[in-house]
């Protein structure tokens, strides 16, 4: 039963992540297809650029929730946590893998949307939602660092890459040296080999950086568009 429940949750999280929020909002509010405007991306940054600040913020929040809400519900769903001491050693490695897979499923859904011919955004907001679901301190810090880098350098793509990298570094430092300070879920105390979970976040970050490949090339060539704060 639990195997079926997990499979259902994985598919549900993927489908939820697949909802092309920016595309839907663009068409509903301004009859604009983000795929044909600006950078062609359906994420929050292009929504800011094409639809304006108000709708860009809404797209960011909804994409954030695609990662934050489902994983938060799962992490506090007691059915999946081992309660009998005699079964903890057996169940914990499987639990670690379940959490790791569920953590990246909304990200994969956003990047490879079922409703957009398996194309999508770069999943920055969704990833931040996932991080925030178990450690709000690090998740919010990632948003703050993104804003700082964006103000300093003016490039949303560069700011996303730098902030994502810093968040991964903070996760490992917090795990190795700070006893998971700020973590709302007992990852270290109830799960064997929690490193698997952090490696899954690292893997997702590598995919995010790879999705910025064209942006990186433009940054190197000096042709990347700067973010317009005035719109």
From Swiss-Prot:
One GO biological process term: phospholipid biosynthetic process
EC number annotated for this UniProt entry: 2.3.1.275
Ranges annotated as spanning the membrane: 6-26, 55-75, 95-115, 130-150, 152-172, 196-216
Gene Ontology terms for molecular function: acyl-phosphate glycerol-3-phosphate acyltransferase activity
Pathway assignment: Lipid metabolism; phospholipid metabolism
Localization, UniProt: Cell membrane
GO cellular component assignments: plasma membrane
Major site of localization recorded for this protein: membrane
A Pfam family annotated for this UniProt entry: G3P_acyltransf
HAMAP family linked to this entry: PlsY (MF_01043)
Subunit structure: Probably interacts with PlsX.
Family: Belongs to the PlsY family.
Stated role: Catalyzes the transfer of an acyl group from acyl-phosphate (acyl-PO(4)) to glycerol-3-phosphate (G3P) to form lysophosphatidic acid (LPA). This enzyme utilizes acyl-phosphate as fatty acyl donor, but not acyl-CoA or acyl-ACP.
Protein's recorded name: Glycerol-3-phosphate acyltransferase
Biological source species: Aster yellows witches'-broom phytoplasma (strain AYWB)
Record lineage: Bacteria, Bacillati, Mycoplasmatota, Mollicutes, Acholeplasmatales
């Amino acid at each position: 039963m639990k195997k079926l429940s997990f499979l259902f949750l994985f598919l549900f999280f993927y489908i939820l992540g697949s909802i092309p929020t920016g595309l839907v909002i663009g068409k509903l509010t301004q009859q604009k297809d983000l795929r044909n405007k600006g950078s062609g991306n359906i994420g929050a940054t292009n929504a800011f650029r094409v639809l304006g600040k108000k709708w860009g913020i809404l797209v960011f929040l909804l994409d954030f929730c695609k990662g934050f809400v489902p994983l938060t519900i799962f992490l506090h769903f007691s059915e999946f946590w081992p309660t009998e001491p005699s079964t903890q050693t057996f169940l914990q490695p499987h639990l670690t893998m379940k959490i790791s897979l569920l953590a990246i499923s909304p990200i994969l859904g956003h990047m490879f949307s079922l409703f957009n011919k398996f194309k999508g955004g770069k999943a920055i907001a969704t990833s931040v939602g996932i991080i925030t679901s178990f450690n709000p301190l690090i998740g919010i810090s990632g948003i703050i660092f993104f804003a700082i880098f964006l103000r300093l350098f003016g490039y949303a793509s560069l700011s996303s890459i730098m902030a994502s990298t810093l968040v991964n570094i903070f996760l490992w430092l917090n795990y190795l040296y700070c006893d998971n300070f700020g973590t709302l879920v007992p990852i270290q105390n109830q799960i064997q080999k929690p490193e698997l979970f952090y490696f899954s976040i690292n893997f997702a970050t590598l995919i995010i950086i790879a999705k910025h490949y064209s942006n990186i090339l433009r940054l190197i060539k000096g042709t990347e568009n700067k973010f317009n704060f005035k719109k």
